[in-house]
A protein has these predicted regions:
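Short, solvent-exposed secondary-structure capping/transition elements
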Residues: 33-35, 61, 120, 124, ...
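Intrinsically disordered, low-complexity acidic Ser/Thr-rich regulatory segments
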Residues: 78-106, 140-142
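Short acidic/His/Gly/Ser-rich catalytic and metal-binding motifs that mark active-site loops
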Residues: 61, 82-89, 130-133
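Short alpha-helical segments that sit at the start of domains
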Residues: 1-83
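Amphipathic alpha-helical dimerization/coiled-coil segments
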Residues: 149-198
Length: 198
């Protein structure tokens, strides 16, 4: 018996998960060619988000060049040389608008807040002035950039919990609750776009 493989409705397809990226970044592994940090010194939330978005852009550009290579194979043309591949990658990467990929800072902030509630990330005690404080020194209420690092609990948490911290934090809701929420959400219809083949 064969099962049809198809994605579930709703949600966004991503080459890698947000939780996985945050954990690997804060461990200092530099996931998806991002910057490597000192895990003991930690990093601030805005920097993690910035590197996550750039990594998503690189993954999308790489997928687009791989798609072009597949088209070249189908059309009987030779695949890109490594130099041509890199050139196409850089070209496509430069054309991706910053807000094209789906993650927005508010969503990331909520996700990070769940990690704080679970006790998986904690403050290091280091703070630095935020850009708002630098531009408007008279604005005392502007929050500083606070540095976070992974806690022992966060390092020991399994992958499935990192992939859905909201479900880990609120297990009483269960997957059926989230399925029902998605079912009741009315996604807007997209206008048809041009095919890549034309």
């Amino acid at each position: 018996m064969t099962l049809a493989l198809r994605p579930d409705q709703g949600g966004f397809l991503r080459p890698f998960g947000c939780g996985w990226f945050i954990r690997e970044f804060m461990l200092g592994h530099g996931p998806e060619d991002s910057a490597k940090i000192n895990p003991d010194a930690g990093t601030c939330q805005a920097d993690i988000f910035y590197h996550y978005k750039l990594a998503l852009h690189r993954a999308y550009a790489d997928d687009a060049v791989a798609w072009e290579n597949e088209e070249r194979i189908r059309n009987g043309k030779p695949i890109y040389t490594p130099e041509e591949y890199q050139e196409r990658f850089e070209h496509l990467l430069s054309r991706i608008p910053y807000k094209l990929t789906k993650c927005r800072y508010h969503s990331f902030q909520r996700y990070f807040h769940w990690l704080k509630q679970l006790g998986w990330v904690g403050l290091t005690g280091k703070e630095e002035p935020s850009s708002v404080q630098e531009v408007m020194p008279d604005y005392d209420d502007a929050p500083p950039r606070k540095y976070y690092r992974l806690t022992r609990k966060g390092k020991e948490a399994p992958d499935y919990e990192w992939s859905n911290p909201q479900l880990t934090l609120y297990p009483e809701r269960g997957r059926d609750y989230f399925r029902e929420k998605r079912r009741n959400h009315h996604y807007s219809r997209r206008k048809p776009t041009k095919s890549r083949k034309t």
